[in-house]
């Protein structure tokens, strides 16, 4: 296994001193000597309330904002000012902003770039130089970013590139947030265990170039996430077909915005699909 980005990384001023609220991410914590599940404070529990806000606005403590930028790219922001962009393509909008972390998958050019912004401190590729894959465990204090390797179909034939892609997991503010990437197969038992309990999952719902709809629904049932954020949908009704299939098991919220702000305390009681509308970042406008 090719290991990268392990240990403490550079972070914006103040974040190194911001402790990370432990998540209950790892499903096998009970089997690891000395490991414990995080306990919620008294009175904590899932609530249906979550609020929307513009990307890059200041965040209250223990809140995380997820903004849908385009295709499979989301901006994840923390109260301490850390940020990560998933499936980074080199363009996130008409802005000079750059994230602290960029993750990439190599399924297509719409999921990665060979020329990332050199100002980004941590660019995490979801693939390694060999079939052994890559291992990321980037600890920025307030946020931990790690990956679980998955296989990928070749873009040129029917062969399979073992460990050629990754599911990225972001542990922040007590939440476990997963980005399934360009997923081509259902995870096996070991991969599910490595992912752990995802509170929030970003899932490709095109039903064609990634998993077909029945298999993606099986994955989401297995993950049992509180919030599902659909991504990677195209014209022709792929989003509508997913929403129709999910509506029997999930509450559906059509936000009409590109951002949602969540906390461990505000997770919905019933598993919920939150449909965000993609929108690139823009430079702040003068008042």
Regions found by a protein language model. Give the residues of each.
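Metallo-beta-lactamase
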Residues: 2-153, 175-180, 199-203, 236, ...
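Active-site-proximal loop/helix segments of hydrolase catalytic cores
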Residues: 152-223, 234, 238-240
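Residue-level signal for inorganic ion chemistry
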Residues: 228
């Amino acid at each position: 296994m090719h290991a990268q980005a392990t240990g403490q990384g550079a972070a914006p001023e103040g974040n190194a001193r911001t402790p990370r609220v432990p998540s209950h991410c790892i499903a096998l914590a009970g089997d690891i000597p000395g490991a414990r599940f995080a306990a919620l404070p008294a009175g904590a529990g899932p609530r249906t309330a979550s609020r929307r806000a513009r990307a890059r606005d200041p965040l209250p403590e223990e809140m995380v904002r997820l903004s849908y930028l385009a295709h499979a790219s989301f901006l994840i922001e923390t109260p301490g000012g850390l940020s990560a962009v998933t499936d980074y393509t080199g363009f996130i909008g008409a802005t000079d902003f750059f994230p602290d972390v960029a993750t990439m998958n190599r399924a297509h050019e719409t999921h990665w770039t060979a020329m990332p912004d050199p100002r980004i401190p941590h660019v995490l590729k979801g693939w390694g130089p060999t079939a052994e894959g890559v291992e990321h465990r980037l600890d920025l204090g307030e946020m931990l970013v790690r990956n679980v390797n998955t296989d990928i179909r070749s873009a040129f034939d029917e062969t399979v590139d073992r460990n050629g892609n990754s599911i990225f997991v972001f542990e922040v503010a007590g939440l476990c947030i997963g980005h399934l990437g360009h997923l081509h197969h259902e995870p096996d038992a070991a991969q599910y265990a490595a992912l752990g309990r995802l509170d929030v999952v970003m899932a490709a719902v095109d039903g064609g170039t990634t998993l077909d709809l029945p298999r993606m629904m099986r994955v989401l049932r297995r993950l049992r996430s509180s919030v599902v954020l659909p991504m990677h949908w195209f014209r022709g009704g792929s989003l509508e077909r997913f929403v129709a299939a999910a509506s029997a098991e999930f509450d559906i919220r059509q936000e009409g915005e590109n951002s949602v702000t969540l906390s461990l305390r505000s997770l919905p009681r019933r598993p919920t699909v939150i449909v965000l509308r993609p929108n690139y970042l823009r430079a702040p406008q003068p008042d």
